[in-house]
């Protein structure tokens, strides 16, 4: 079979020496997250298909939790889980699938809709990365790649079928997927389909999380045409649909209605009847403490809803890879569409958020003597359309619907300059972005320059140092720009008390400046012939300016009148909500990874810790994951056939919380076991069996800043048969 150099490079990088290695692969070459096909490219942290099959994770965030300072945010519902990288998550981490950005982001809902069965590998860049991907990459980048026929065909076969069935006991999750694929000298094609069905999730000690059942189904089609050795085109289409009944805030355990909030407010103010005024007037500090407790223990107002999320993406790729050092070109055209639909169970009120993204990416790399360049242009247009239902009861106080558009154009340049016989490598990069957002009545536009540089010093053949400086930014989202109407409200004394969104025309982009240094030691044949030992240590400090937060407050006039007269409208509830630049933050931490590997044995450990504080007040930041340390072992009982492993992870107590956060989080230890039967030859070479037992001792625990408990003991089994 004949494929271009790029196709072969992509395919061969997927091969791993150890099917169950949980540690980071530091030596493979990747061109997805870094956008850099040169031999000097920075190597991101990666989860291969083998490690994904072994772990049997149910979300991208779950699959990455073994990586230091990468944690799960969003609770225990898999659809709501998002990676938290060095204390930053949500729209501060860029999500990429097959080289294309995924921009859907709706507060307290999911945004990672790609099922694990359609993921071939995941790459993670930790730290600001706007010089590569533009707005949003303050915390880093999570890049996923779906499979093609070349990944799945074996031994020069021209046709194949892969069938997989998975099952997990914690929620009776059944995972079914089938792939059919074929290739010849010119063409390759893949068609995959999947269906996942889960019941309510079991947490530690046998408790059940209500309204965590779900269904997800969909498929992927890919077609490739190898025109000649230098030209290749690919067309892919992916479509998934997710269904569940859950609180509209997917991160909370149970629904929290306006009526429940109002009852708590009345009780706090000593109001026993709607027709009677409050009997107490709490101090500002008491009021602040009360409202923070409601938020941190229960979450925001959230009604039980039937939810559907259709998600689709179409991508056209063209690769030009002639035998020319100046040309290594990739062009991608794409169209993404995501719709989030909700209907309240009791009242039937409907909401809908629809985001369409169309764009083009152009990238080329050139080798000029001893200098490598990678450069490109990105353009994307986001269009959002929202619907927000109202009524006179449970949907009386709602945000207004809004429609808006956003256009972003970015140009970037990466250079690699080796010096002193490649003992020293200087890699500067820069990106310029121009963006505008507009509704029918308002338009905003701005631009931003994001520089970065990396210095690598190879001291000896077993020691090297890397120093980085990266800048990043996040432009205000369309929701932050254009949301209006009521945030929440209550009716007491026959009066409506309404908290309303207030537009902020002076909202500035968030910016980050990150400094980090890494030391990497690596030895071959250290204790015995053929063994390998690696240890890597990183320290980082990320200064983030102009954090955008939603602030709830009273204006001076309302506060004064409320203090003088408790019956004044606004005395019970703050009147205003506004997105503001209110925090200058510092995120700093360390990461340690070590691995020792022989032909059959792999020992590994990793440690990650992030501290976050407000630089102005010194107060701890919210949503910073607890420090964690993990140790593990993998051993091939039968070489090239049967491997077993175990990991023990200790999560430290998280007591560094903001002053108005009423909850701290105790420490806990989780123990996981795994085994894989995957013979490389013989009559069962087409069969792979994976078994995992997570949270072996059924610990009851709650991750830091989560509003619900984590998954209890969970036995997992997966069978894959290919022919």
Swiss-Prot record:
GO molecular function, one term: siderophore uptake transmembrane transporter activity
Subcellular location: Cell outer membrane
Transmembrane regions listed in the UniProt entry: none
Alphabetical UniProt keywords: Cell outer membrane, Membrane, Signal, TonB box, Transmembrane, Transmembrane beta strand, Transport
Pfam families, A to Z: Plug, TonB_dep_Rec_b-barrel
A single GO cellular-component term on record: cell outer membrane
UniProt-listed InterPro entries: Plug_dom (IPR012910), Plug_dom_sf (IPR037066), TonB-dep_rcpt-like (IPR039426), TonB-dep_rcpt_b-brl (IPR000531), TonB_haem/Hb_rcpt (IPR011276), TonB_Hb/transfer/lactofer_rcpt (IPR010949), TonB_rcpt_b-brl_sf (IPR036942), TonB_rcpt_CS (IPR010917)
Motif TonB C-terminal box: positions: 706-723
Cystine connections: none
Top-level lineage group: Bacteria
UniProt signal peptide: 1-21
Primary site of residence: membrane
Domain TBDR beta-barrel: 158-723
Topological category with respect to the lipid bilayer: Multi-pass membrane protein
GO terms classed as biological process: siderophore transmembrane transport
Job description of the protein: Required for utilization of free heme at low concentrations.
Family the UniProt entry places it in: Belongs to the TonB-dependent receptor family.
Protein name as annotated: Heme/hemopexin utilization protein C
UniProt gene name: hxuC
